């Protein structure tokens, strides 16, 4: 079991349904496990829940609700598996995601930060062990000129096991 911090976006119903429709076809690893989200703190197995909750509550006080716009898909080789991922990348709101991520990786999480993996704010919408399939998925998305507007007003601290995500605390920005 690991702890993870997720930003679950507020989306218009049509955008949520469109994302879920795409994920149902192309997100074989996570569609049935977790809702559309942005990962702010990646799996941490070594910190207890109360300590992480306190840290996130303290760090989140520096932030308010913010908006983002997704307009572009990009593929990225997973750092944790042999899969390639398809990400929707926020064109607007990008810097706030980065600052939020950086604020979380201070104090007790400072040594958990993977400096060998660049942080790219993203919403995962697809994955496959065949990188060329992922490239085709991303090309399909980018041809559509998507524009998905959403907001982030809270962070969820979750327990993550292989096929299970359970929210243990919601922290409002």
Label every model-predicted segment.
Residues 1-173:
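Histidine-dependent nucleotide/RNA phosphoesterase domain, centered on the 2H-phosphoesterase fold
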């Amino acid at each position: 079991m690991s702890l993870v911090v997720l930003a679950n976006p507020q989306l218009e119903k049509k955008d949520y349904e469109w994302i879920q429709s795409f994920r149902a076809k192309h997100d074989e690893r996570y569609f049935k496990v977790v809702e559309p989200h942005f990962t702010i703190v990646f799996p941490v197995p070594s910190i207890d829940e109360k300590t992480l909750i306190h840290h996130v509550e303290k760090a989140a006080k520096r932030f308010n609700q913010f908006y983002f716009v997704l307009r572009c898909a990009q593929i990225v080789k997973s750092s944790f598996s042999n899969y390639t991922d398809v990400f929707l990348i926020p064109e607007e709101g990008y810097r706030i995601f980065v600052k939020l991520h950086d604020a979380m990786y201070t104090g007790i999480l400072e040594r958990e930060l993977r400096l060998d993996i660049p942080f790219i704010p993203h919403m995962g919408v697809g994955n496959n062990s065949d990188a060329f399939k992922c490239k085709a998925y991303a090309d399909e998305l980018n041809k559509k000129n998507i524009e998905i507007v959403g907001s982030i007003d809270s962070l969820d601290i979750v327990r993550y096991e292989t096929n299970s995500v359970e929210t243990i605390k919601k922290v409002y920005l």
